[in-house]
C-alpha cells in the first residue's frame, strides 16, 4: 500500500478501536498489526500507507480518540529492520486470527 508506518500507543482496547476507526476513516491507511500489553491496558496500533496519509491518520487519532495516546509516531521509509519487526508482528496477528 505504502512505504510508511504510523504508530499509536493508547490505553485500552476500546480506545484503540476508536483510534483505528478514526485513522481508517481519515486517510487511506490500513492496519498492519496491533499488540496488546499489560493485559490489554496498553495497545499499540500500526497502520501503513503513504507518508502523508499516515501522518494525517495519526494526527487525527491523537486529536480525537477516546483517550489520549501514550505515544505516537510516523516512520517514512522505515529501515529494513523495522519492516521485519512489523511483518513478524503481523504474521503472529494473522496466525491468531486463523485459530479463532
Feature annotation, model-predicted:
Residues 48-54:
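Helix N-cap motif at beta-to-alpha junctions
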Residues 36-39:
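A short beta-turn/loop motif at secondary-structure boundaries
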Residues 27-30, 61-70:
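A common structural junction motif
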Residues 13-28:
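Short amphipathic alpha-helix segments
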Residues 72-82:
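Metallocofactor- and cofactor-centric catalytic cores in central/energy metabolism, strongly enriched
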Residues 1-11:
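Short glycine-/aliphatic-rich beta-strand segments at the starts of folded cytosolic domains
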Residues 81-100:
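Short, low-order "capping/linker" segments at domain edges
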Amino acid at each position: 500500500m505504502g512505504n510508511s508506518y504510523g504508530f499509536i500507543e493508547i490505553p485500552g482496547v476500546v480506545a484503540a478501536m476508536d483510534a483505528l476507526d478514526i485513522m481508517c476513516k481519515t486517510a487511506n491507511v490500513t492496519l498492519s498489526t496491533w499488540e496488546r500489553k499489560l493485559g490489554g491496558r496498553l495497545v499499540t496500533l500500526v497502520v501503513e500507507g503513504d507518508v502523508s496519509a499516515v501522518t494525517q491518520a495519526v494526527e487525527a487519532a491523537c486529536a480525537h480518540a477516546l483517550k489520549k495516546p501514550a505515544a505516537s509516531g510516523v516512520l517514512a521509509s522505515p529501515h529494513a529492520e523495522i519492516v521485519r519487526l512489523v511483518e513478524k508482528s503481523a504474521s503472529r496477528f494473522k496466525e491468531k486470527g486463523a485459530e479463532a
